[in-house]
Design a protein with these regions (language model features):
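Active-site-proximal loop/helix segment associated with metal-binding centers of metalloenzymes
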Residues: 96-107, 120, 124-125, 131, ...
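His/Asp/Glu-rich metal-coordinating catalytic cores
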Residues: 5-31, 35, 41-182, 193
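C-terminal regulatory/interaction regions
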Residues: 2-5, 225-349
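Binuclear metal-ion centers of metallo-dependent hydrolases, dominated by the metallo-beta-lactamase
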Residues: 132-133, 147-231, 303-349
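Structural motif
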Residues: 52, 113-114, 137-139, 173, ...
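Short, polar loop motifs at secondary-structure junctions
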Residues: 13, 29, 38-44, 58-62, ...
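Short, well-ordered alpha-helical microsegments
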Residues: 46, 102, 124-125, 184-188, ...
Length: 349
């Protein structure tokens, strides 16, 4: 590496998250700091109370929706591809393909480029801008599904199973667990693309974010609240709720529902059984193993840093392929099984 600065002097792991000493800012800090670059709106990456937040306009809108208009003292919205500078450090945001407004932070200083991916995926998502690979010296990646066993099927195939079940069980409501930000809207759009034109019923926790997505140009079709209905009123209909609501008294309003859960973890049958899921749908907002490897091969980093997740498989891949790698083991980033109903809780999928 020919740069004038070492990677660990540009970005370093700290108890509060990744810190940039020359720029004096953090990326996705897990506690309030003076200056934060936020990659996306999920609660384990986007927290309230920072002095200043640099993020895409959509992420800032999501944070304001979830935490209130005073979630930060200073907002700095940056468009995809636009560069902001602080203390001579350039920060450019490029699409991550995770959820609406999600971005990778491209940090450049003294000839060294480091990319903080945040959470990302590579497959098409009708609700957000697709991932953009950026060649760099150091790529800092998540590893939620960082094992070869995690090879997810096509989304259309999984949604097709849901539509097929609706045809097989026309008298039973189909209750789908999907995270309030990103996954719920994606499942709705995938259902629309599969030809499902009937109203989709939603838990109250989804309503404000659904409206935000609609304002940002994502057409969700007819949406109705899943409240105030007779117990057998939703036979043959789709209702979407945060995953924990399926196991909560909220779900008792449905008579003998088919319970489904949209998550990459549904590839693990024991997890589906543990949750009592009748119809597991393998739909993830995180890169699976082939997508992770595709990304590394495209960005061609000299070093690979792994922030959180199952790093052992990726460390072994890097060793075999002659790429220097290290696991940062950052704390505070939850996997999608930890979601609970309510604002400000981990809810990425």
């Amino acid at each position: 590496m020919v740069s004038m600065i070492r990677p660990e002097d540009l970005l370093r792991p700290t108890p509060a998250g990744l810190y940039c000493p020359p720029g004096d800012f953090y990326v996705d800090p897990n506690r309030p700091v003076d200056r934060a670059v936020v990659t996306h709106g999920h609660a384990d990456h986007a927290r309230s109370g920072h002095g200043a937040v640099l993020a895409t306009d959509q992420t800032i809108k999501i944070m304001a929706e979830r935490y209130g208009e005073d979630f930060t003292a200073l907002r700095q919205p940056v468009a995809y591809g636009e560069t902001a500078s602080h203390n001579g450090v350039d920060i450019r945001l490029v699409p991550a393909g995770h959820v609406l407004g999600s971005a990778q932070a491209v940090v450049t200083y003294q000839g060294l480029t480091m990319v903080v991916s945040g959470d990302y995926k590579r497959r098409r998502d009708p609700t957000c801008t697709p991932f953009e690979p950026v060649p760099c010296h150091v790529f800092i990646s998540e590893a939620t599904f960082g094992l070869p066993v995690f090879t997810h099927p096509p989304d259309a195939e999984e949604v097709g199973r849901l539509v097929q079940s609706l045809g097989q069980f026309p008298d039973r409501a189909h209750l789908v667990g999907a995270y309030a930000l990103g996954k719920a809207q994606r499942v709705i759009r995938l259902l629309r693309e599969a030809g499902w034109e009937r109203p989709i019923y939603v838990h109250g926790a989804l309503e404000r974010l659904n409206r935000l997505y609609e304002r940002e140009g994502v057409d969700l079709g007819p949406i109705l609240p899943a409240t105030g209905l007779k117990k057998d009123a939703l036979g043959g209909e789709v209702a979407i709720a945060p995953p924990s609501a399926i196991q909560d008294r909220w779900a008792r309003r449905f008579a003998d529902p088919v319970t489904a859960f949209a998550s990459g973890w549904m590839l693990v049958k024991a997890r589906a059984k543990q949750r009592g899921v009748e119809l597991p749908l393998v739909i993830s907002d995180h890169a699976d193993w082939p997508e992770l490897i595709q990304t590394f091969e495209e960005v061609k980093p000299e070093e690979l840093w792994i922030t959180h997740g199952r790093e052992e498989g990726l460390l072994r891949w890097a060793e075999i392929n002659g790429v220097k790698a290290r696991a940062l083991r950052l704390v505070g980033y939850e996997d999608e099984d930890e979601e609970v109903v309510g604002e400000g809780t981990p809810d990425q999928g």
